[in-house]
Structure formats: C-alpha cells, structure tokens
Curated annotation (Swiss-Prot):
One of its GO terms (biological process) is proteolysis. Transmembrane segments: none annotated. Its cofactor is Mn(2+). This is Probable cytosol aminopeptidase. The active site is at K273, R347. Belongs to the peptidase M17 family. Binds 2 manganese ions per subunit.
Length: 495
C-alpha cells in the first residue's frame, strides 16, 4: 500500500519544532490555544496583509513569529461556523496536508474560536490529511518533486480530548486505508495488474479475517458463466471471480452484498476503442477496486455486519479467439445475450457476478459499482455517480450517504420504455441499446439479473478516475465508493 504519514493526537501545548497550523473561522479570530502559539500577536497583521478572511480551506503561510520555537506557520480558514459539515473537516485536513507539503514535523492546533471541536471532528481532520497525502509515485525514479515522503511526515493534532480523538481516528484510519488500497489498484498499470494479480491483492485481505475464495476459469465454466467468460476469451490472461466474506454480524444475519466490475484493461475488443486516451482503460476495474477497498475498511474497523464482496476480473482484448459482434452467449442465469458491441463488456461481467451473488448468498441487498458507460459522464459530469435502483429505500440511503461523505450520487430513471431497447429477435436480449439513453439501457440490462433482490447500480465512470482534483484527492484514481458504501453500512446495517 502507498506510504502514509503518521498522525497522532495530543493535548494543547506550545509547539517546539517544525511547522504549525492554526485554524480561524470566517471573519473571526484565533482561539485561545492558537493565540498561545502566537505570543507576539503578529498573525492578525498577517491576515490583514494577505486579505485573509477565513474562508473554508483558504490558507495563508508565514515564517514563525518571533519568540516561538517552531519554523513556519500556516493558517487555514474553517469558513462559516454554522455551515461546517463532516466534509468541511476533511477539506480542512486536506488543506493542512497541502500547506505542510515540505514539512516533516507538523502540529495542527485544532482550536477554533467559538467552537468546541468533537473527537470525531478532530479525527476527520486527520482523515483529510491522510486522503490528501496520497501520492502514487512508485514508478518514478526521481520523487523529490512531491516534497518530503509521506512515511517521513508526522502530524500531531492538538485537541481537547486526544484519547477520544485517537479512538475515533482508528476507524477513520481503517477507512482511509481502504481508500488508499482502491486508489492503488486503479492507478496500477495493467501490465502489472492482471486478473490473477488483482485476485492476489484481494486474497491478502485474509490477514484481516476476510474469507476469500478465488474461482478459476474452469470453475466458472462449470457454473455456466458464459457472459463473463465470453469477454475474457480474447485475452491470454485467465479470468477470475473473487468472493470475499466478512462475518462480523450475527451468525444467521443475511449479508449485505457489493459487486464490482473488474476489467483490468479494456481495449474494446473487436469493437476496438480509439487510440486517444485508451491508456485510461487500465482503470476500468475501479468498481472492483472500490469493493476490495470497502471490504478492507469493514474488516479493519471490525464492522458489526455480514458483508459479501464479489468481483469479476477479466481483460478485454481483440485477438483471434476474441468474442465477435453477432455472437450469442448464455449467462449463468440461463438467459441468452446477443453481442452487438464487444465494448459493452462490463455489463456481461456483472450479469454473471450479480446472478452468482443472488443465488449463492440471498443478500439483504446488492450494490454493484462499475465504470460502465461514457453516457453517464455526458449526463452527470464528474461530480455525481449515476444511481439506478429497483428499491426506493436503498436508493434514499445511498443518496444520504453520498451527501454525508461527499461521494455524491444522482438517481436516474428505469422503466419498460427503456427495457425494450435491449430486446432482440435473436436472443433474450442484446448487450447494448444503441446511442440513446446509454447509461439507462445498461442499467436495464443489469436489472434482468437481480430478480426481486433490492439492488442498486452505481455507474462511477465519471467519478472513479480522472476526476478534478479536490482538497482530499490529487490522484488520478479517487477511490470513489469506499467511503460512500462504508457510510451506508455504518448508518443502516450494523449491530
């Protein structure tokens, strides 16, 4: 896993070395503990000179005031005190990490005038620091442009109750590790991370108590997974289906289930993609990466739930054995599918994975994640994932979790008028409905493989990779879905 900084918590005390970060509300002043770190009272003059107003995540930096033992100081705005949310504290932590890029020892004085920060808020500052500190540079031979290495950095967050904050951060850190893992998997080049290697990364979760089974091509053939195997047949790299189980709930409690599309590289197959930006298709397994990251987070924080994670891992290549347009395959469900476009392959992988999950585990619900369609980017851009669901309660809970974490979703329609667009004379269905409503017809296709199980499909093509940089992510891979689904579980399916 990518290196992380050390994050600790302590009581308020005068900083003795390194860099110091102070927090100031919009239009406000330094808090009592922060004021003690500025004995000469020079920071208000710095604010005035820099026209610093305390806007959320705004930053001003200066040399340490005379008479202090530390080297540099940065002040970060916390914005309007009445508008602060969980996301705000993550952003503040991210701004702190950015301000301390070239510092080894950093003290964050989590004291805001007029506010009493909770342990959870202090922990979220730490999580924001963790998320912003992620840098994927393992293949760079010269890494100095990224400042001091994360492993050599230590952030000490001073707060009112450091013991409670440390306890809260233990869970937050587990979540951060899950995001790091998902980002690592998506950022990894496809020549390094094939289906077998990806499965090995998931298998490593056994060290956390996750039960992991890896189904081979032969085992999938016995199960009748013709849809998934049809995608894989053009690659010399064999496919895998990985089944992860975390049993932290009651013995007879039905599990919650998460299914991820894991196309480790997508050329489009015989319906080959244009060359421009094809390198980004190493990230066409971001849905599977999020599921692995989520299972890591649930296990690491000892979530009191039973959860199943299933990922279908294939490579879509155009060799002489590759699937052709016009082919008809039989899915595990027994339903037949006419292949119209071999670049609509992710839904074929998910069709068998969803059916296997439904039949094998009878879960409370299934949520699948997939970088499924470019159409969802046209519809929603990069700020929301597309949400399609057959269950209003599940949809509402996902939407609320998205608002809380900042990993936002937007519900899209489903209906018979869209479903008929994937009908065909030659088989039970075809794998694409054409240009119109492309993300919706893809979801309608998946819906045919879930029966009455409560289900949601998250199309994360616009949010999982190549999204705009933010206060908590500067990486090409965002790890989208890990925090969203962890919150869904924590709020509704534990205990």
């Amino acid at each position: 896993m990518t290196e992380k900084p050390t994050i600790a918590f302590a009581k308020f005390a005068a900083p003795k070395k390194g860099s110091v970060i102070l927090l100031v509300p919009e239009g406000g002043n330094l808090g009592q503990a922060a004021t003690a770190a500025d004995p000469a009272g020079v920071m208000p003059k710095v604010f005035a000179a820099a026209e610093f107003k305390g806007k959320l995540a705004a930053t001003v930096e200066a040399l340490a005031p005379q008479g202090t033992a530390y080297d540099r100081v940065a002040v970060i705005g916390t914005g309007n005190p009445s508008a602060l949310t969980e996301q705000s504290w993550l952003q503040i932590g991210g701004a702190a990490a950015a301000a301390a890029k070239n510092a080894g020892e950093v003290t964050v004085i989590a004291d805001v005038a007029g506010l009493e920060l909770s342990a959870r808020e202090a922990a979220n500052i730490g999580l924001g620091i963790l998320l912003r500190s992620y840098v994927f540079d393992k293949y760079k031979t010269r890494r100095d442009e990224n400042g001091i290495k994360a492993r050599d950095k230590k952030f000490t967050i001073q707060c009112a109750d450091p013991n409670a904050a440390k306890k809260a951060f233990a869970e937050a850190s587990a979540l951060g590790d899950g995001v790091y893992l998902a980002r690592d998997l998506v950022n990894e080049p496809a020549n390094v991370l094939g289906p077998v290697e990806f499965a090995a990364q998931a298998k490593a979760l056994e060290s956390l108590g996750v039960k992991v089974d890896v189904l081979t091509e032969r085992e999938m053939k016995k199960l009748g997974m013709g849809a998934l195997l049809g995608v894989a047949q053009g690659s010399v790299r064999p496919p895998r289906l990985v089944v992860m189980q975390w049993n932290g709930g009651k013995p007879k409690q039905k599990p919650v289930a998460f299914v991820g599309k894991g196309v480790v590289f997508d050329t489009g197959g015989i319906s080959i993609k244009p060359a421009a930006s094809m390198e980004d298709m190493k990230g066409d397994m971001a849905g599977a990466a999020a599921v692995v990251g989520l299972m890591h987070a649930l296990a690491a924080r000892k979530a009191k739930t039973n959860a199943v994670g299933i990922i279908g891992l294939v490579e879509n290549m155009p060799d002489g054995n590759a699937q052709r347009p016009g082919d008809i395959v039989t899915s595990m469900s027994g339903q037949t599918i006419e292949i119209i476009n071999t670049d609509a392959e992710g839904r074929l992988v998910l069709a068998d994975a969803l059916w296997y999950c439904k039949e094998q585990f009878k879960p409370q619900f299934m949520v699948n994640l997939a970088t499924l369609t470019g159409a969802i980017i046209v519809a929603l851009g990069n700020s929301h994932a597309g949400l399609f669901s057959n269950d209003d309660t599940l949809s509402e809970r996902l939407t609320a979790a998205g608002q809380a974490t900042g990993e936002k979703v937007w519900r899209m329609p489903l209906g018979s008028e869209y479903d008929k667009l994937i009908d065909t004379k030659n088989a039970d269905m075809k794998n694409t409905g054409g240009r119109q409503a492309g993300s919706i017809t893809a979801a309608q296709f998946l819906k045919r493989f879930v029966d009455d199980t409560p289900w949601a499909h998250l199309d994360v093509a616009g949010t999982a990779m190549g999204s705009p940089s933010s206060e908590i992510n500067q990486s090409w891979a965002s790890g989208f879905g890990v925090r969203l689904l962890d919150r869904l579980v924590a709020d509704h399916y534990e205990g």
